[in-house]
Amino acid sequence: MDSSSKPMNGSAGGSPVGDERKMGDHEHEFRISIILLRSFLLVLVIISEALMVTDRETGSVPLPFFGLPRPVFVTKTAKYELVTGLKFYVDALGVVIGYTVLHLLFNIGLVATKGTVVDCKSVAWISFIADSMMGYLLLSSAAVATEIGYLAEEGAPAVLWRKVCNAFGYFCTVYAISVVICFIAALVSFVVVGISAYHLFRLYGIQQQAAREKEKLSAEM
């Protein structure tokens, strides 16, 4: 038999079987990397959420009254529930936590069972779009909390809004830490979006290459 005959499936010359194995290897590596990154993201968001939800401080706030030589001090407890924007912040982080947990369970299940969804581009598209939405949700919620924190720190004399961080220093410190961690989580989430986009469009390239190899093999047979 001529030694220069056409390569069999799985030979070094490339084949649909080799391309499918390449797709499977890429899928497994992608799942492992995304599990680690999403786990890090989840830890950041949980810490940010926990700091804001548990942040409490009781202090005395001066209330000036006309006709009185000195302001009247009233005891108040600073907490996120008092501000609508911070309720949005906490709710947004809760949504991201829920989504990330579900996505982690999905990916862990695929790795544990050696499952694959490489042929389902619709799933990759949904994941990419949802990841993008979570990233923008984190960024917008952190921006809202930053604006509220700025008003609490500096006040707004033009509309007679007083500074409150001078009376609630501990609350504002923990508040700031929570917001900074949220911004870091937003950056990590956009790294996740980038990986999702890379995986999505790589699927198109690998599948197109596999289709060309199949057509070439059919033509040579």
Curated annotation (Swiss-Prot):
Self-association state and partner proteins as the record states: Homodimer and heterodimers.
Q: Which residues cross the membrane?
A: 32-52, 92-112, 123-143, 175-195
Extracellular membrane side: 53-91, 144-174
**Location(s), subcellular:** Cell membrane
- Protein name, please? CASP-like protein 2U10
Q: Name one GO cellular component term.
A: plasma membrane
Region Disordered: start-end pairs: 1-22
Q: Which UniProt keywords apply?
A: Cell membrane, Membrane, Transmembrane, Transmembrane helix
How does the UniProt record describe the way this protein sits in the membrane? Multi-pass membrane protein
Q: Which family does it belong to?
A: Belongs to the Casparian strip membrane proteins (CASP) family.
Q: Which organism is it from?
A: Selaginella moellendorffii (Spikemoss)
Positions on the Cytoplasmic side per record topology? 1-31, 113-122, 196-221
